[in-house]
Amino acid sequence: MAHITINQYLQQVYEAIDSRDGASCAELVSFKHPHVANPRLQMASPEEKCQQVLEPPYDEMFAAHLRCTYAVGNHDFIEAYKCQTVIVQSFLRAFQAHKEENWALPVMYAVALDLRVFANNADQQLVKKGKSKVGDMLEKAAELLMSCFRVCASDTRAGIEDSKKWGMLFLVNQLFKIYFKINKLHLCKPLIRAIDSSNLKDDYSTAQRVTYKYYVGRKAMFDSDFKQAEEYLSFAFEHCHRSSQKNKRMILIYLLPVKMLLGHMPTVELLKKYHLMQFAEVTRAVSEGNLLLLHEALAKHEAFFIRCGIFLILEKLKIITYRNLFKKVYLLLKTHQLSLDAFLVALKFMQVEDVDIDEVQCILANLIYMGHVKGYISHQHQKLVVSKQNPFPPLSTVC
């Protein structure tokens, strides 16, 4: 395939379209396929050749694809992105004209994926040249992908087999990748609503559902909806292909903090298996109620946690660590009326700086308000009075 002529290539394209062979047509327009490295196909002006073989709008679509291979060959991703935009626009015209059929869905997947990739590359080139701010091209790409999404979502054909709605989840996942990259998570909301109300939501491919749950789980985590986040991220982790160690590790980076906030600590074996030992000391610190160790562990791996976007989530573990430390005080003193001084001593032992009785009251008030401690503070007697039943409820019942 690497060195076929332009005429042979266009003949293959013609036959794929004529026979409604979506998979073959997708390969012929995808940058994952080796034909893009063929110098014979990298053309600056292929329009005339394409018009001789292909009907509109396919002539325009594949001419843009050949110009795109030419641009990529010259490492000009700004031009490649422009060409890819034309490809998607002309594809959309053809796709809408295919009434009551969805054979071209694989083609849409190929051109949509390349659009996102080239938008990202173009962004980087433009930012280096000082011509645009980060995310401008990705934002424009998202608008075009939304046009594709609308075409799929509005296909109200009766026959589900031939419905374009099968393309919705792939596009949503591409849009999620963009929105997370440009930090516009609020734009995910209408897409989540559309998928959750779709009668196909459980019938999409496992791979697409795993990607979807991964992003929706991450969004739930940022929204502090930890139970929902645990459900989605656990689904993604359990259904992710066992050979995809890298993807499973990526899911765990977000699932671990969520699980820890719900009181489920990971084993050292799990952390070793997925090369996530950065969490080991954090886990130990939270379990032991060791504030000093938690502070040190977060500081030690701060760069990694910030890069992953979980540092602020992990900081929420501080309140859980207070809870675990204060539970130890309760277990040690074996009484339901606990002197506030006992908590002050525990905090000073953990080298918490400038702590006084007012701060102890403030921490305890927070723990009571959040449901981590069942009880009340008796200011008159300077005591914490805890419930005789389950004074420290399991974290999973609280968050």
From Swiss-Prot:
The keyword Phosphoprotein applies. Residues 210-391 form the PCI domain. The modification Phosphoserine is found at residue 45. Keywords: Acetylation, Cytoplasm, mRNA transport, Nuclear pore complex, Nucleus, Phosphoprotein, Protein transport, Translocation, Transport. Its main location: cytoplasm. One of its GO terms (biological process) is negative regulation of lymphoid progenitor cell differentiation. It is found in: Cytoplasm; Nucleus, Nuclear pore complex. The modification N-acetylalanine is found at residue 2. GO terms for molecular function: double-stranded DNA binding; RNA binding. InterPro entries: Csn12-like, PCI_dom, WH-like_DNA-bd_sf. GO terms for cellular component: cytoplasm; nuclear pore nuclear basket; nucleus; transcription export complex 2. The keyword Glycoprotein does not apply. Required for B-cell survival through the regulation of the expression of cell-cycle checkpoint MAD2L1 protein during B cell differentiation. As a component of the TREX-2 complex, involved in the export of mRNAs to the cytoplasm through the nuclear pores. Binds and stabilizes BRCA2 and is thus involved in the control of R-loop-associated DNA damage and transcription-associated genomic instability. Blocks the activity of the SRCAP chromatin remodeling complex by interacting with SRCAP complex member ZNHIT1 and inhibiting its interaction with the complex. Component of the nuclear pore complex (NPC)-associated TREX-2 complex (transcription and export complex 2), composed of at least GANP, 2 copies of ENY2, PCID2, SEM1/DSS1, and either centrin CETN2 or centrin CETN3. The TREX-2 complex also associates with ALYREF/ALY and with the nucleoporin NUP153. Interacts with BRCA2. Interacts with SRCAP chromatin remodeling complex component ZNHIT1; the interaction results in inhibition of SRCAP complex activity, preventing the deposition of histone variant H2AZ1/H2A.Z to lymphoid fate regulator genes and restricting lymphoid lineage commitment. Belongs to the CSN12 family. This is PCI domain-containing protein 2. The lineage of its organism: Eukaryota, Metazoa, Chordata, Craniata, Vertebrata.
